[in-house]
Amino acid sequence: MQKNITNVSDTEQQLEIILTAEEYQPEYDQQLEEARRSIKIKGFRQGHVPVGMLKKMIGPSLEAEVAEKMASKHFSAIADEEKINPASRAQIDSFNFGDGELTIKISYEIHPEFELKDLSAYSFTQAEYSVTDEDVEREIKLILKGHGTMVTIEEAAGEGDTLIGDVTKLDADGNAVENGKNENHHFNLEYLPADNPFRMALEGRKAGDSVEVNVEPKEEGGEAIRYRVDVKEVKRLELPELDDELVKEITQQRFENVTDFKADVKLQLQAHFTDKSEQDLLEAMSAKLIEEHPVPTPKAMVASFQNMLLENAKRQMGGQFPKSLNEAEFLETLKPNAEKHARWLLVSQKIAKENELNVTDEDIKAYAEKEAEKEPSLTVEQLVSTYMSTEFKDYIIDTILKEKIYDVIKSKVTITKEATPIPEHQG
């Protein structure tokens, strides 16, 4: 057997395999004999069709089958011998039987060769969140809003109130536009931006007030649109008093007093923002290393990530896209993001290889012990059994390996902790 490897690009190779008749003939004869036994031709007993006739009938398909078998048999051995790292399935480009030889040309993609940058040259800032009593009170207020009651008020609307009114579109002369009325529209001032024209016009208004609102055009040269809002009602969310009885109701008896409830809210907030800090750091590190390693990405790898992103988007839309969406065009818009995913996979695999990272059964057990602390209803033994199952093992190995890769990165880069306040949010 002869073999010739040609580099087509940084991520593509072509392998030429040349086999002598002595090497491929046994396979050819076997395929021919199997065909002879199974093919039925009128006028001949099954298994007794003349070889010459059989070759004329199925010669091309027989040769294709033999070429496929020979390519499959020899490619993996050559890949091991030549240290080829395929990134896609090998495809037969061509084959030729002639002069006592079988020549097969196979194309495939490979992982590109590249050098990792010195990780110690990179610095990152990690947010260090500390939950204050004020943060806890804000979070509890959000929880109480879910148990509040909307009540009608006579006073002027404040920033957290809701106004209900009829909205009428006006023409340039201030007259109502035909079919331009929207009755009982709700304006929740809390969720309107501070510079929203409706919010600016309606704050401080009471039931019975009428106010005109001018909405400036989004595009230069456009005309402003005028509206009149006739306020019919102002509502305010009245929050219940936080006491032990409400705590029992909110937590379904998990906590029996306000003190314990507040302590748990603080604990949950701290856990959430500690996790957010870690995830933000990991994302910043991977984004930087993707940027610093502009390695070429195999097409098959990119296509795989494109399809993954497409399916994720489809799931978020309830399992199918709107009919108006051109799926092929949308798939193409996902390509830049897919290339980043592929590049990160190449970089992370390189880090794992250079640091000889692997996942052992002991690693899986340690991971199960850590997860069991988060979920007291499950024992370590139950989790180990699940993680070692055929269905979950590959996923768990991948998860643990990712952790090890990030641990290597964190051990080499410089990380500066920065005290950061908990961001305020509305609800």
UniProtKB/Swiss-Prot annotation:
GO BP term, example: protein unfolding
Record Gene3D superfamilies: 3.10.50.40, Trigger factor ribosome-binding domain (3.30.70.1050), Trigger factor, C-terminal domain (1.10.3120.10)
InterPro entries: PPIase_dom_sf, Trig_fac, Trigger_fac_C, Trigger_fac_C_sf, Trigger_fac_ribosome-bd_bac, Trigger_fac_ribosome-bd_sf, Trigger_fact/SurA_dom_sf
EC identifiers of the protein: 5.2.1.8
Localization terms from the record: Cytoplasm
Keywords of the record: Cell cycle, Cell division, Chaperone, Cytoplasm, Isomerase, Rotamase
Main subcellular location of this protein, as a coarse class: cytoplasm
Domain comment, as recorded: Consists of 3 domains; the N-terminus binds the ribosome, the middle domain has PPIase activity, while the C-terminus has intrinsic chaperone activity on its own.
Function: Involved in protein export. Acts as a chaperone by maintaining the newly synthesized protein in an open conformation. Functions as a peptidyl-prolyl cis-trans isomerase.
Protein name from the UniProt record: Trigger factor
Provenance organism: Chlorobaculum parvum (strain DSM 263 / NCIMB 8327)
